[in-house]
């Protein structure tokens, strides 16, 4: 079994969720490194993808020295630099965007909307969902604010997102923020959706075999 090196800390709740789910599934050895969230968000906001990719590559190098043989980032927004990172990473990457795109296609969804940070929603997941129609809702700011409320543990944000989901003319909503897995699951979600975190976790477990 391959050893996973996970870059976490963006945010911490989602990182803990990744750890819990991987442990519950009986994953092999896991190495975790905590990224500087302020630096990452500043770089994403400035579209400084080359510098951000270099930062992540250095973190992955440290994970590799610790014994990791495959790597991943436990957050969606930092994947803004994933194409640049793929060119310089010292370890194979399992990236959440490609895993999510494959899941959307497998389910036959043609038109989707995204829930997540403003960066992710407005950029249509950084334009990387090839061949999939991604609409940008008029409520981008409301989605961002509701998402941040869910990160803070509030229930109002979840209710707002559920209401917006029912109003959107799409086949499904992509939960494109890892913290959303902390508030949405199959028991409380009554709209068609793709949970990118759970999709990513399945891809990670497959890559570790």
Predicted feature locations:
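Non-catalytic structural scaffold of enzyme domains
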Residues: 1-209
């Amino acid at each position: 079994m391959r050893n996973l090196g996970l870059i976490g800390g963006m945010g911490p709740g989602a990182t803990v969720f990744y750890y819990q789910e991987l442990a519950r599934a009986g994953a092999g050895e896991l190495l975790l490194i905590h990224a500087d969230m302020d630096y990452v968000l500043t770089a994403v906001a400035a579209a400084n993808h080359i510098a951000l990719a270099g930062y992540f590559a250095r973190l992955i190098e440290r994970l590799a020295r610790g014994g990791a043989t495959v790597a991943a980032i436990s957050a969606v927004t930092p994947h803004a630099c994933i194409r640049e990172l793929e060119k310089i990473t010292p370890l194979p990457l399992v990236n959440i965007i490609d895993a999510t795109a494959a899941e959307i296609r497998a389910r036959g969804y043609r038109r989707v909307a995204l829930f997540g940070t403003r960066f992710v929603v407005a950029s249509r997941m950084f334009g990387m969902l090839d061949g999939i129609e991604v609409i940008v809702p008029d409520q981008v700011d409301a989605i961002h604010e509701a998402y941040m409320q869910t990160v803070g543990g509030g229930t109002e944000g979840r209710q707002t997102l559920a209401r917006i989901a029912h109003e959107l003319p799409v086949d499904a909503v992509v939960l494109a923020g890892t913290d959303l897995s902390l508030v949405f699951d199959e028991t409380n979600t009554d709209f068609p959706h793709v949970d990118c975190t759970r999709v990513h976790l399945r891809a990670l477990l497959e890559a570790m075999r």
